[in-house]
UniProtKB/Swiss-Prot annotation:
It comes from the Eukaryota. HAMAP family: Ribosomal_uS2_B. The keyword Plastid applies. GO terms for biological process: translation. The gene is rps2. This is Small ribosomal subunit protein uS2c. Belongs to the universal ribosomal protein uS2 family. GO terms for cellular component: chloroplast; mitochondrial small ribosomal subunit. It is found in: Plastid, Chloroplast. One of its GO terms (molecular function) is structural constituent of ribosome. Pfam families: Ribosomal_S2.
Amino acid sequence: MTKKNWNINLKEMVKVGVHFGHETRKWNPKMAPYIFKERKDNHILNLTYTARFLSEACDFVFDGAKRGKQFMIVGTKHQTADAAKLAALAARCHYVNKKWLAGMLTNWFTTEARLEKFKNLTKKKNTGGFDGFTKKEAAILKRELNKLQEDLGGIRYMTKLPDIVIILDQKGEYTAIRECRTLGIPTICLVDTDCDPDLVDIPIPANDDGRGPIRLILNKLILAIRAGRELYYKK
């Protein structure tokens, strides 16, 4: 795997609070190697490990993007939803930021069928295809289209399973992680002090509740994806 300098700065991580963990009573003992100390009944993460795993994750997505791999970013809680969407759009990734639908990946045949319906209804609406229906029928179709937009808007251009999935909140995205593990899709995930680092392929010890830490880590990953994509398109 390519090893590059991604300009990961410990002072920058401290400034946005990447090191702040949860209350000590909520911890997962599997996170012990990544905890620096306790402070006022809260755990403080060791940012040396954060920098190490973030660098590894950047190298991994860079190599993937360089080979034309497809990425998905998952962040459905309110602290992560906007960041997930903005990052995905910046790097042309798929994203889920509303709700993870059970079976989205493991039942890909059904997801694919819904995506096709979404595509057809969108085309019909944009070309005046709803005009031939009664008001009631058109209203039903519009509601169906809005529901598909809410559920699948971030993956509307997906034609196959993603190659790499970036997850911003392990505790809230267990279903997504389980589906990725079932299918053998590599995962990169922020892991706070209450998480299980063994559930994902590349855990990044970090505060997963603050918008600042989430944005900082995502920005590094997106930078790496875009750098890899540039090389891919130059081939």
